[in-house]
Amino acid sequence: MENLLQQLISLDQSLLLSLNGSQSLYWDEVMSLITTTWISIPLFIALIYAIAHSSTPRYFLATVLAIGLVILVCDQVASGICKPLFQRLRPTHDPAIMHLVDIVDGYRGGRYGFISSHASNTFGLCVFLSRLFRHRGLTLMLILWASLSTYSRIYLGVHYPGDILYGALVGILSGYLLHRLLLWAGRRWNLFPPHRTASFRCTPSGYRVADVKMVIITLLLTYASILVWAALGIGR
């Protein structure tokens, strides 16, 4: 058992070193931007608008509360339980590997990294919102958003791939269960929005397709802005 654990740790370290960093200042800047929370603010604003536009006030409040619970549960499981429990050092703090890790602008993150809060939060929201809107295009964009956000943590050297994998699994389970809770609450207290008329094209769950497309465009424009911003930021 101890042998197997050591093999898994060695594999995790090898994967990290093969995926971490690059020789490009441009991609250093791109990943430094993608990893920040504030870069997703336009996406969250667009999502809130899309939810509000197709919901009754009660259902809107219930949905926002459920989204808040996704973030709270994922963050507390990752940072409040797993990190202090397992105390696995981040690659940037691990004496066995820290001198081999490519870091950007001196950023090393906190002391412990298992499991990744970024992974649990982003994949939790990805699953919850995908099941909420039930629109294939938005689901693909949310998977891209969660994947890029979590890969940026490996690129910057602050998480092992294993931290990301288990964080994502916690997020996926949390997002799924909390969406089921929202559905139960909607049926229990009759919170669902009224049936949409044929005058609007809607997703199977009742959200306007035009609003969903607006969310997708917002995310695409955010990534386009990151690419331009990173190009302008080279050499700073």
Report each predicted region and the residues it spans:
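N-terminal transmembrane-helix/juxtamembrane module of multi-pass inner/ER membrane proteins
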Residues: 1-43, 78-108, 195, 232-236
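Hydrophobic alpha-helical transmembrane segments
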Residues: 34-51, 65, 118-121, 141
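Hydrophobic core of alpha-helical transmembrane segments in multi-pass integral membrane proteins
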Residues: 42-51, 68-72, 214-230
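Hydrophobic transmembrane alpha-helices of multi-pass, membrane-embedded glycosylation machinery
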Residues: 46-52, 147, 169
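Membrane-water interface at transmembrane helix exits
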Residues: 48-52, 74, 78-87, 130, ...
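Interfacial segments of alpha-helical transmembrane regions
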Residues: 48-77, 139
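Hydrophobic faces of alpha-helical transmembrane segments in multi-pass integral membrane proteins
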Residues: 65, 69-74, 78, 166-174, ...
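Membrane-embedded catalytic cores of phosphoryl/pyrophosphoryl-handling enzymes
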Residues: 102-236
